[in-house]
From Swiss-Prot:
Subcellular location per the Swiss-Prot or TrEMBL entry: Cell projection, Cilium
First and last residues of every LRR repeat: 34-56, 57-78, 79-100, 101-122, 125-146, 150-171
UniProt keyword Repeat, yes or no: yes
GO biological process: axoneme assembly; chemical synaptic transmission; cilium assembly
Cited function: Cilium-specific protein required for cilia structures.
Protein name: Dynein axonemal assembly factor 1 homolog
UniProt keyword terms in alphabetical order: Cell projection, Cilium, Leucine-rich repeat, Repeat
Compositionally biased intervals (Low complexity): 309-318
Signal peptide interval: none
Family designation: Belongs to the DNAAF1 family.
Gene for this chain: dtr
């Protein structure tokens, strides 16, 4: 199918120009496409990108949360910068070539398996790529990221990446700054994940959920060098730096505050948290030196203490305060945190050396020999303070003294040892010429005078020093040239170069005065790192070698020995000050030296015999020799170099002029240029300690191993000279292997170890992904195929429907010739069958048939239509739309056959009179159902969270918390008080017990039910009566409230007892309830029409049994007929015709209906029985047993009554005896009945309790005997009734007299109901031709469906006659028993209640025998009654009445206004107000007719005295 069709089926939205403009309007954008730079198209259901050609100026396009499967349609969007395509169905990155300016691309939550087509050649400025939640899984899917040179933000979270080789890809992304990998398996598989990625990505500033701080990177680099110990140390350095920053900021604030306060009120500055006392400074400094492998403080002293007289004096005071409160380790950490230009490189020293040499050379050229001698001495003195500090694993300090002669050398060596340099750091004393030279005391200042007086050596000294000056100047230049190329020359010239630099540094150091020595290392370090240091400035202005002694410029150039002496004294004073400071720093060196020795032995393999000396100075020298890897070689080279220099001096010093000396020095310096370059490289390596520590390069990696970025941060030096030939000489470090190399080996080993596993897992995952993708493709294809077929079906149906409409409109005549189309009749939904107006009529057809007589259901219509489509398309086509082609005519005929069988049976069963009575019954049924529901709910109101109250005669819910009134919730279908014909649960069928048993399917014909119930009743009743009598012997005092409920008017009693409006389950009980109601309707119809002698042959009996047993399966197949069913229908039709004949004779025997009040019979003060009027008789038509309510004068228990109802779990008939104020039902407690005249208690008989089998037999689903027995049973019942009357006369003293109550009612209401029912029948008849063929209609017209009005009149006459007979008999019994009989007749309306008038009176409802000829009972039943009467005379009548009523309940009374006879006891009769009573004497004549209804068998005269209000 084409793409367009598929879009229509899936319901996705097309991206049209009109729709785009509407979206622009909605988002308040421009209607002119080219004016918009942003377009919001998200959450629109688009499947493809199209029609964007006019939006040429778009810079931002939002397309997330659509159904886009391909990137396309962007050819004109050349200015697009941001494209958002997350939450779509994209599988490949493509078609982005036109968007050359694309900066941000979001492809999250798609189906992408490989990153491609986004390289710099396609998207040259792509900066951000978000591709989270896709199907990326290995390094191959990410390999194209290497081509994204400008990509700086990459989000790969929540993919399936598990390949650790992706680190190699990230290493090649030089601009990657933000990386998100969380949610991938590789995060847990990559060892030291965060450190590894920080080291791999040099520019990374953000990793996953947090930034990459400089501290993180420094710690990662330290971990790479020295492992976890190095990381810990680096972390501690950063912590100290942070603390020092905080402390310095606080101290700065304190100093500013103190500047405005008098001295006595100033606050002290904060001390270091590491040292609370100045006495701990030495210890802290040594710990720092041991940790960091350096002595930075000495380096700072040497390199920084050169302040000018102008600037140094102004800052000394504040700097002293700072220095006093800061420990040396904090100063070091401060340098760590401020990584700028490398302070440690000896740039200033080199420049100072060159400046001093230039000054010396200039002085040599401009002054006479005596002045030269003085300058040389000064230069020699200045060389005494040269100190070289180098940071290695073993810290070392080389303090080398190079005097002009032996005495000078000895004095300087003594000075070095007295100043205590060796107490802080390793001090190497380089022995020159004479190793056995004695050490002289520092105090002997006279030695300096001897140096001056020895003029015979000055010329040679000058020659040597002038040559050295040129050598050092050339060495400094070479040093700067060799620093960047990171290469070594040979190790042969280290001694001479170090000696020269030490002389220079020492000269500058001892020139400092006392005030300048106290300045902090920070300030002076910054000053010395400046490109234009104070030394050079001072030299330019004053042309002085020593800038701190500008005031002595003139005197120095003078040949006066006094100035020279003063200068030497000042130098000695400065040395003393430095010695004192160094001793202060190194007070606690002994313990630290032991630690230093131990750490040194671990790094450099040493022989223990080298540190065997016990002398302090000798131990220190030996320790320095062990710690310094260059020391032995330096010593030897130093000696060689010095020897060579002295030989040159001796050979050139004698007899040369100043000019010749300059020429000689210049020539020889040219010859030694190459060697000096080697010295410069050695010196560069010797001074590399500070940069290594500051930048974390490590103690085992020298400057030539530095990373490029660290090299770029060093001081800018001059041109680079490459000497690759000599590189290998010092390539390797002294130690065996660095931690960096070890880490590399470990990484390589791990990579090799995991390579195979990675490859295998990658292959497995790749196969699984391919399989999943293949399955996805198959499923997608199948979906499209299904939608394609459905589309074709819809199109075909649509076209056919159009053709049908045209054909039905224009060619209506053709319908009769060929059944191409069918008349559907009115199409109604399943909920529209019932009438909505009164009166209510029973349904013509059971719901199982979907009421085809009134209109087909939608399902039937659709089936018919499908068949029509089949015949229209191709009559010969065997299959169309998956259905077998059938003609609609066949289905119509099948429906007609159904109507002929069961539907017509029900029509015959219901006459107009029965329908009219049913209307009245349903009205009363509704009233009683509502009353019973409300009363039971009210009685159980305590069970609910909210209470139920009666408000204005309406049951309302009272909220417990707020007290608000609310209507009751709508009841479920089981409790619905609507009179819909679909709702027939008022007469449900239940079995005894707990109500959990549900009956099977509905019987097909009501006659089967009735016959079966009679057969089972015959077998069980005798046993039941005996069981009841035996139980009464032991439970005479028990009372069971059997006050009649309306005839199955509502649900069974157990349901109402369990009713909880909050937990109504209408699905469980509604279906069986409806089925029971249908059964009841059939039974009722049969009782009205078929109560006479129906003799059926064997064939009919068999047919009924078969039909009944298969009714369950027929309900779901109402449209399918078979020959067996047709036979059944034919037999049933015959039975119906015969039934009509019996019905005509039956109506002749029926009595005239009268609406009578309740009749109560009493003997003395005891109420015998009470018969409810009207609805009681109506609703007893289908009762399986009657419930007799007897009075217990001893005990009344409402709970027992309820228990009885639950045990029977069957519909109870209620006598609705009400007053205007109160409603009585079986939940209302009955008070104890007392005979106020005699004071005696009346014996109460328990009602019979029927077993479950007996009750179930009333609704049995099968036939167990031939239906001919029914006739015999009915005849026996009639005979026993006559015998019963004669037996009562034989026992007059034990029989209770009856008081008859008779009231004639108007027939107006009955006639109105009858007219309404007939009107409905007329409507039904009018529509029958739509469904039935003419033949069937003609047959129906021949049948009689109702009786005439004349027949109704005869019925009324018969009823009156029957009542007369009963009254006459009752009067005779009354006269025979006692003269104390009080015959009281009270006429009440439906709501009157005798218990209100007579306080504690108890009454019981008893169903009246109003049709003796229609009430058969078994001989066994009546014989059992007579046997019990002999055994227990006091209980005989109640038992007999119970059995008779039980038998009577199996038959249906005439559906007209009924008669009620009630017996009762009236102990409070004498207490009633006579004003409200009226007594009349009534005489009646009764005629007993024969079975045919036309012969008078007997005439009786009845006299009664009636009292009423």
């Amino acid at each position: 199918m084409s793409l367009s069709n598929r879009k229509e089926i899936t319901g996705l939205t097309r991206m049209t120009p009109k729709g785009l403009k509407e979206l622009c309007k909605k988002d308040k954008l421009y209607q002119t496409p080219r004016l918009n730079d942003t377009l919001y198209l998200h959450y629109q259901g688009f499947q493809c990108i199209e029609h964007l050609e006019e939006y040429t100026e778009l810079k931002c396009l939002w397309l997330e949360c659509n159904a886009i499967s391909e990137i396309q349609g962007l050819e004109k969007l050349s200015k697009l910068k941001c494209l958002f395509l997350q939450n779509n169905l994209i599988t490949k990155i493509e078609n982005l070539e036109p968007c050359r300016e694309l900066d941000t691309l979001n492809l999250s939550s798609n189906h992408i398996r490989k990153i491609q087509n986004i390289g710099t050649n396609i998207l040259p400025v792509l900066n951000t790529l978000t591709i989270a939640s896709n199907y990326l899984k290995d390094s191959e899917s990410l390999s194209d990221l290497v081509q994204c040179k400008t990509l700086s933000v990459l989000d790969l979270s929540n993919n399936r990446i598990d390949d650790i080789l992706i680190v190699k890809i990230f290493e090649q992304m030089l601009n990657l700054k933000v990386l998100v990998l969380q949610g991938n398996p590789v995060v847990s598989r990559l060892p030291q994940y965060r450190k590894t990625l920080i080291l791999a990505c040099k520019e990374l500033t953000y990793l996953d959920s947090r930034p990459v701080f400089p501290r993180d990177r420094a710690c990662a680099e330290a971990w790479k060098r020295d492992g976890y110990e190095g990381e810990r140390k680096e972390n501690n350095r950063w912590n100290r730096a942070e603390r020092r920053k905080t402390r310095e900021s606080i101290n700065c604030t304190i100093r500013i505050r103190n500047s405005h306060r008098p001295p006595d009120q100033q606050d002290p500055l904060l001390r270091s948290s590491d040292s609370e006392d100045d006495t701990c400074t030495g210890t802290t400094l040594k710990k720092v030196a041991l940790e960091n492998g350096c002595v930075d403080d000495i380096w700072k002293e040497v390199s920084c203490e050169h302040p000018t007289s102008e600037s140094g004096a102004s800052t000394s005071s504040s700097v002293e305060d700072n220095d006093a409160t800061s420990s040396q380790d904090d100063l070091i950490a401060e340098k760590l945190s401020n990584r700028g230009t490398l302070e440690g490189r000896p740039k200033v020293l080199n420049e100072t050396e060159g400046s001093n040499l230039k000054r010396v050379n200039q002085n040599i050229k401009n002054v006479e020999p005596r002045n030269i001698q003085t300058i040389v001495f000064e230069e020699d003195v200045s060389k005494k303070s040269q100190v070289i500090i180098e940071e290695e694993n073993v810290p070392k300090i080389n303090l080398i003294n190079e005097p002009c002669d032996l005495n000078d050398k000895k004095s300087i060596i003594v000075k070095c040892k007295k100043t205590g340099y060796t107490s802080i750091g390793p001090v190497h004393k380089k022995t020159v010429f004479h190793e056995d030279a004695e050490i002289k005391k520092m105090e002997d200042v006279v030695l300096c005078q001897d140096f001056i007086k020895s003029e015979e050596h000055m010329s040679s000294d000058f020659a040597v020093n002038s040559k050295l000056g040129k050598d050092i100047e050339q060495t400094c230049t070479a040093q700067r040239n060799e620093a960047q190329c990171k290469e070594f020359d040979e190790d042969q010239k280290i001694i001479e170069i170090e000696s020269k630099l030490i002389h220079e540094m020492y000269e500058s150091f001892e020139a400092d005065d006392d005030d300048k020595l106290n300045e902090t290392f920070d300030l002076n370090l910054y000053e010395t790192t400046s490109e234009h240091h104070a030394h050079k400035v001072s030299f330019d202005e004053n042309k002085m070698p020593m800038s701190c002694y500008q005031e002595d410029k003139e005197s120095i150039l003078l040949p006066k020995s006094m100035e020279e002496t003063l200068f030497e004294e000042e130098c000695f004073i400065a040395n003393d000050k430095c010695a004192h400071d160094l001793e202060e720093i190194g007070r606690q060196m002994d313990e630290d030296l032991a630690e230093l020795r131990q750490s040194t032995q671990n790094v450099v393999g040493l022989s223990k015999d080298e540190i065997a000396e016990t002398d302090i100075e000798t131990d220190e020298e030996d320790l320095l020799a062990q710690q310094d890897p260059y020391s032995p070689l330096l010593k030897q080279q130093f000696k060689n170099r010095r020897m060579k220099i002295m030989l040159i001096e001796e050979s050139k010093a004698q007899g040369e002029s100043q000019r010749d000396l300059n020429i000689t020095v210049s020539n020889e310096s040219g010859g030694d240029d190459k060697q000096d370059q080697l010295f410069a490289r050695i010196l560069d390596d010797a001074t590399e300690n500070i940069p290594k520590r500051i930048f974390g390069t490590g103690c085992d990696a020298l400057s030539y191993n530095w990373p490029q970025e660290e090299c770029l941060l060093q001081l800018t030096l001059s041109e680079v000279k490459e000497t690759p030939a000599q590189e290998s000489t010092f390539k390797n470090s002294i130690t065996n292997s660095s931690s960096f190399e070890e880490a590399n080996k470990i990484c390589v080993h791990m990579d090799q170890k995991m390579a195979e596993e990675e490859e295998a897992l990658g292959k497995l995952l790749h196969d699984l992904e391919n399989e999943a993708e293949h399955v996805y493709e198959i499923n997608t294809k199948m979906t499209y195929e299904e939608t394609t077929s459905s589309k074709e079906v819809v199109s075909i149906c649509t076209s056919l429907l159009d053709d049908i409409i045209v054909e039905l409109t224009l060619n209506e005549i053709l319908c009769h010739e060929k059944p191409k189309s069918f008349k559907f009749g009115p199409i109604e939904s399943d909920e529209e069958f019932s009438y909505s107006l009164e009166p209510q009529l029973e349904k013509l057809v059971p719901p199982a048939l979907e009421d085809p007589a009134r209109g087909k259901s939608l399902r039937e219509c659709l089936d018919t239509f499908s068949d029509f489509v089949s015949s229209m398309a191709d009559p010969k086509l065997p299959l169309m739309l998956g259905r077998n082609p059938t003609l609609g005519v066949e289905k119509i005929r099948a429906a007609q056959e159904l109507l002929k069988s069961k539907n017509l049976a029900e029509i015959y069963a219901d006459s107009a009179e029965s329908l009219n009575s049913q209307v009245a019954k349903e009205i009363e049924k509704r009233k009683r159902r509502v009353a019973a529901t409300a009363t039971r709910c009210f009685n159980q109101r305590d069970k609910y969270d909210d209470t139920l109250e009666l408000v204005n005669n309406r049951l309302m819910i009272v909220k417990r918390d707020s007290g608000d009134l609310e209507e009751l919730p709508p009841p479920p279908p089981l409790i619905s008080d609507s009179e819909s014909e679909d709702y027939d649960t008022a007469d449900d069928e239940y079995t005894p017990g707990k109500g959990s048993h549900k009956l099977g399917s509905k019987p097909k014909d009501s006659k089967n039910l009735v016959t079966n119930s009679f057969l089972k009743e015959k077998q069980a009743d005798s046993d039941v009566v005996e069981e009841v009598v035996k139980k009464n012997d032991h439970a005479e005092d028990e009372f069971y409230s059997l006050e009649a409920m309306t005839t199955f008017s509502s649900l069974d009693a157990e349901f109402f007892q369990k009713l909880d409006l909050q937990k109504v389950n209408d699905s469980e009980d509604s279906e069986p309830a409806i089925n029971c109601m249908r059964n009841y309707n059939e039974l009722q119809a049969y009782m009205k029409s078929g109560s006479l002698n129906h003799r059926m042959n064997t064939e009919e009996t068999k047919t009924l049994q078969t039909s009944f047993s298969t009714v369950g399966s027929d309900e779901g197949k109402t449209k399918l007929r078979n020959p067996q069913e047709e036979k059944e229908n034919a037999l049933l039709k015959k039975m119906v015709l015969r039934m009509k004949e019996y019905e005509e004779r039956e109506h002749q025997l029926q009595l005239v209906p009268h609406e009578l009040g309740s009749v109560k019979l009493s003997l003395g003060g005891s109420k015998l029985f009470e018969q409810t009027p009207e609805t009681v008789l109506v609703h007893t038509e289908n009762e399986p047993t009657s419930k007799i309510k007897f009075i217990d004068n001893k005990k009344t228990n409402n709970d027992e009554s309820t228990h009885l109802i639950k045990n029977y779990c069957e519909p109870l008939v209620r006598a609705s005896c009400k007053t205007s104020n109160k409603s009585i039902d079986d939940d209302i407690q009955s008070d104890v009945s007392t005979d106020y005249e005699s004071g005696e208690e009346v014996v109460v008989v328990e009602p019979p309790k029927l077993s479950e089998a007996v009750l179930k037999s009333f609704y049995s689903d099968g036939f167990e005997a031939d239906l001919n027995m029914v006739h015999e049973l009915e005849e026996a019942t009639r005979r026993n009734l006559y015998c019963y009357h004669s037996n009562e006369m034989l026992n007059p003293t034990k029989n209770h007299p009856f008081s008859l109550k008779k009231t004639l009612s108007s027939k107006t209401s009955t006639n109105e109901v009858t007219v309404g029912a007939k009107a409905k029948w007329a409507k039904i008849a009018e529509r029958l031709h739509e469904f039935l063929d003419p033949e069937t209609i003609s047959k129906l017209n021949k049948e009689q469906f109702g009786e005439s009005d004349e027949f109704e009149d005869s019925q009324d006459a018969n009823i009156f006659t029957d009542i007369t007979f009963e009254e006459n008999n009752s009067k005779k019994y009354e006269n025979l028993v006692s003269e104390e009989c009080n015959c009281t007749k009270s006429i009440y309306d439906e709501n009157s209640c005798p218990s209100e008038l007579n306080g504690n009176d108890q009454f019981s409802g008893l169903k009246e025998i109003n049709k003796d000829k229609e009430m058969p009972t078994s001989n066994l039943e009546l014989n059992s009654v007579m046997i019990q009467s002999k055994k227990k005379t006091s209980e005989i009548l109640p038992n007999e009445i119970g059995n008779i009523i039980k038998a009577c309940s199996s038959f249906e009374a005439p559906p007209t206004d009924p008669i009620g006879i009630e017996h009762f006891e009236d102990p409070t009769l004498t207490q009633m107000n006579p004003e409200f009573l009226k007594t009349k004497q009534i005489e009646c004549n009764l005629q007993i007719l024969s079975e045919d209804g036309d012969v008078v068998v007997q005439e009786l005269s009845v006299n009664a005295q009636v009292s009423f209000e």
